[in-house]
């Protein structure tokens, strides 16, 4: 459901049923904006979600969450599931498995700002398992001849929808990868301290030793991280009007060595969701529009209507979709190693004298100035070694800290349970 908003927030508005997309000028005042409602029910027991927001104007790409709306999911048997407003514009309700069976149908009802909005009913259609996930190594030639080519992996899936299965699908992907910092910790700057023995101020720099067990743990403490994130792309497919419902080699997404994702270990969790014909048209045109325009930020405003309408004002434009989807998931992991393309750890402060001045924050040897002027510690320094592989204490430099602290690239030090 968050994926829907990620694309709508870019101002992409398309027609759903027309194969030819025509420019559209909305029949709303510049100050009125429009309402966005997204919701979904899956066959997985647990919380089902909806999201409600409004823009301040038609051309505004900032969405303002709407709270304190009355939101309900109603199934075909008349069961009502009231959604709680648990976060800004976010609503949820818990549904047990007994209410999430194949063939059940659901609608979303929203009462907000004195108006009632309802979706069409959408049904849970049967979903086959994902049979396999695999990849092929590829090379991508750049459009700019001055750039180097990239290598990467093209992922594919197979599934068999022969029999009583849905015809329309979309896929979501969550990727996780392990990566290392470019360097381990060897030198730690902890500020300025007063040495009572020598009666003078000194830099507090700790040099770690590989022969000390605790130091070795410190060296590796910020070296290895993991990142998990959603893949921000749309993938849809339909077997409508196709005799063979067995699908092999369906391409999904590409990951390249432009980042650090393929340096150690990479895992992808793919979620396969069934779609009704209305939901498929909605997602498929979002996918087409984003591909044709080189990204959704480059699109012009079009109208994208889903299956939600205002009962009190049929002329009101309501953006978004409520859908019901059966879900199957499968994880694939590979330990393929591809060197990261063109990455360099630059010095922030190079040269011993410059580094001393930077770390001291004032005249060397004198009491340090206001602590607010000192660099934040700890800082991890870059060492240099001589021909005998001995540390040269007069040649430290300060490099980008993300080259030593892997968490500064967005990762966590906690290994995933499935790793």
List each model region and its residues:
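Bacterial N-terminal signal peptides that target proteins for export
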Residues: 1-8
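A sequence/structural signal for flexible, mid-protein segments enriched
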Residues: 21-419
């Amino acid at each position: 459901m968050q994926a829907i908003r990620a694309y709508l927030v870019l101002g992409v508005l398309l027609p759903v049923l027309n194969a030819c997309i025509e420019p559209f000028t909305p029949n709303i005042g510049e100050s009125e904006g429009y309402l966005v409602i997204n919701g979904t029910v899956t066959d997985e027991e647990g919380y089902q979600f909806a999201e409600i927001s409004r823009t301040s104007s038609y051309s505004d790409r900032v969405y303002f969450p709407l709270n304190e709306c009355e939101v309900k999911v109603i199934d075909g048997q008349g069961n009502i599931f009231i959604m709680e407003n648990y976060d800004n514009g976010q609503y949820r309700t818990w549904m047990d498995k007994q209410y999430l069976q194949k063939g059940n149908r659901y609608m979303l009802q929203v009462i907000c700002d004195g108006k009632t909005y309802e979706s069409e009913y959408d049904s849970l259609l049967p979903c086959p398992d994902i049979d396999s996930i695999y990849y092929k190594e590829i090379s991508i030639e750049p459009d700019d001849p001055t750039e180097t080519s990239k290598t990467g992996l093209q992922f594919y899936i197979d599934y068999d929808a022969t029999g009583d299965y849905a015809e329309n699908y979309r896929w979501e992907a969550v990727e996780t990868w392990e990566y290392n910092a470019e360097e381990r910790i060897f030198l730690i700057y902890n500020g300025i301290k007063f040495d009572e023995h020598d009666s003078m101020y000194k830099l507090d720099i700790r040099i770690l030793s590989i022969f000390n067990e605790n130091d070795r743990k410190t060296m590796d403490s910020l070296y290895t991280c993991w990142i998990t994130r959603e893949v921000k792309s749309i993938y849809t497919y339909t077997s409508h009007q196709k005799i063979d419902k067995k699908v092999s080699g369906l391409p999904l997404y590409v990951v390249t060595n432009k980042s650090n994702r393929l340096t150690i270990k990479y895992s992808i969790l793919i979620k396969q969701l069934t779609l009704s014909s209305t939901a498929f048209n909605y997602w498929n045109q979002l996918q087409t529009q984003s591909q044709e325009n080189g990204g959704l930020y480059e699109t012009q405003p079009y109208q994208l209507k889903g299956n939600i309408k205002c009962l009190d004002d049929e002329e009101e434009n309501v953006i978004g979709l409520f859908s019901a989807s059966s879900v199957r998931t499968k994880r694939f992991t590979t330990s393929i190693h591809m060197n990261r393309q063109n990455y360099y750890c630059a010095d922030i402060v190079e040269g011993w004298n410059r580094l001393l001045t930077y770390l001291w924050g004032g005249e060397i040897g004198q009491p340090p100035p206001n602590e607010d002027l000192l660099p934040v510690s700890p800082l991890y320094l870059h060492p240099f070694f001589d021909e005998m592989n001995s540390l040269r204490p007069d040649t430290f430099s300060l490099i980008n800290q993300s080259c030593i602290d892997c968490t500064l690239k967005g990762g966590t030090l906690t290994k995933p349970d499935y790793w």
